[in-house]
């Protein structure tokens, strides 16, 4: 299995990265760190726009090319806890495991550099900026042509929602799309004592908010899991003034592109209809985000066979889809591939992703590294 020195280096790298987190789109020092490591391994650096970084290793056959990806950005969260390698950047922390993903792919890069004579396919190593925001780093890299000559792409996520010792994925839709919305309701304000002389946008907004859920229950195919959530309402300035306008801000999650289209069209129709009934007007804006993550069936089967053969049948887990999103989906829209969860839920990883006390379990690093190595060794 994986060399202990390789794992030790991965842990050291992860802890260094954890101490020096950078926000999405600002990972320039992280990029410099990765570049220095790859250059020390004599791995070619391809010409892609920083702060993402892409390495390339030519295989002995070179008739196939696979890409491996790690995201490198941190979150705007104040870390809680007293570990000796806590974030040194106040208000910024690796609370999703991207420090681990980066360290794991660096370890795999080192293995590749030391075993080039035994590696048949070409390898593209993607260290990707800005997974946590939109427009995302994956979308930008795809537009820049990072997958131009790639046959398949693979990525992992250290996953707190899966038990430690399990590794798994799901063929087909595995993670949801995310599209945000802003609904602006224009009414007619006035004094709070005379509501009959106004068109109260707050009152109208309450009807819109409650009615949005009817789209999920009555307009979307029940076989297409979907969510509409309102996260913010903005309106008014004080207690005795009915305002002119109200804004409703929220998010749409679904595993189906068809459901996205249905939800958006129905939101516009429903909102405009309700507003018209009350004498108000509405403007509905959508902020298009990450598409659903859909694993390729063939590559999923390939990964499942590797997990079962390498780690044992009891390690593989066929996962349930989740309504969280992941911009790895942009790669999978372009090329076949698979996104894989490496479970780590347990005593060392009890808090969920994006929690101020989130922690990854470094004991799962050997399996994650080995998984990538086996994908490289067995891809044909």
Residue spans for each PLM region:
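Conserved hydrophobic/aromatic beta-strand scaffold that supports enzyme active sites
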Residues: 54-56, 182, 339
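Metal-dependent amide/peptide-bond hydrolase catalytic core
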Residues: 206-380
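Acidic/His- and Gly-rich active-site-bordering loop/insert found
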Residues: 1-94, 99, 103-119
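General structural feature for long, well-ordered alpha-helical segments within catalytic domains
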Residues: 2, 6-13, 26-37, 64, ...
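Divalent metal-coordination and catalytic microenvironments
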Residues: 17, 55, 68, 98, ...
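Histidine/acidic-residue-rich, glycine-tolerant segments that coordinate divalent metal ions
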Residues: 75-77, 83-93, 100, 117-243, ...
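Active-site beta-loop-alpha junctions enriched in small/polar residues
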Residues: 22, 71-73, 130-132, 159, ...
């Amino acid at each position: 299995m994986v060399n202990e020195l390789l794992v030790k280096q991965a842990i050291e790298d992860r802890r260094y990265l954890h101490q020096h987190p950078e926000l999405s789109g600002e990972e320039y020092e992280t990029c410099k760190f990765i570049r220095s490591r790859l250059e020390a391994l004599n791995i070619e650096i391809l010409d892609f726009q920083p702060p993402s970084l892409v390495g390339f290793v030519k295989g002995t056959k070179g008739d196939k090319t696979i890409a491996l990806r790690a995201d490198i950005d941190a979150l705007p969260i104040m870390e809680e806890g007293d570990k000796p390698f806590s974030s040194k950047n106040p208000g910024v922390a690796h609370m999703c495991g991207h420090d681990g993903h980066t360290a794991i792919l660096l370890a795999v890069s080192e293995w590749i550099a030391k075993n080039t004579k035994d590696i048949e396919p070409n390898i593209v190593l993607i260290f990707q900026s800005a997974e946590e925001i939109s427009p995302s780093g994956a979308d930008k890299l795809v537009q820049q042509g990072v997958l131009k000559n790639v046959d398949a792409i693979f990525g992992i996520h250290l996953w707190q929602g899966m038990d430690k010792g399990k590794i798994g994925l799901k063929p087909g839709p595995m993670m949801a799309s995310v599209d945000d919305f802003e609904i602006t309701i224009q009414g007619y304000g006035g004094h709070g004592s005379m509501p009959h002389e106004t068109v109260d946008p707050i009152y109208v907004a309450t009807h819109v908010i409650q009615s949005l859920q009817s789209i999920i229950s009555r307009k979307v195919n029940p076989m297409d899991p979907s969510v509409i959530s309102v996260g913010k309402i903005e309106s008014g300035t004080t207690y005795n003034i009915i305002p002119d306008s109200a804004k409703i801000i929220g998010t749409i999650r679904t595993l189906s592109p068809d459901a996205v289209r249905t939800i958006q069209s129905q939101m516009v129709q429903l909102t405009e209809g309700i507003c018209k009934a009350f004498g108000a007007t509405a403007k509905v804006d959508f902020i298009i985000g990450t598409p659903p993550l859909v694993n390729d069936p063939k590559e999923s089967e390939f990964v499942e066979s590797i997990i079962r053969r390498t780690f044992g049948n009891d390690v593989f887990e066929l996962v349930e889809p989740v309504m969280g999103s992941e911009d790895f989906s942009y790669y999978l829209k372009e090329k076949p591939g698979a996104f894989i969860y490496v479970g780590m839920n347990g005593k060392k990883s009890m808090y969920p992703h994006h929690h101020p006390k989130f922690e990854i379990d470094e004991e799962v690093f050997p399996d994650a590294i080995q998984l990538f190595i086996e994908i490289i060794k067995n891809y044909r």
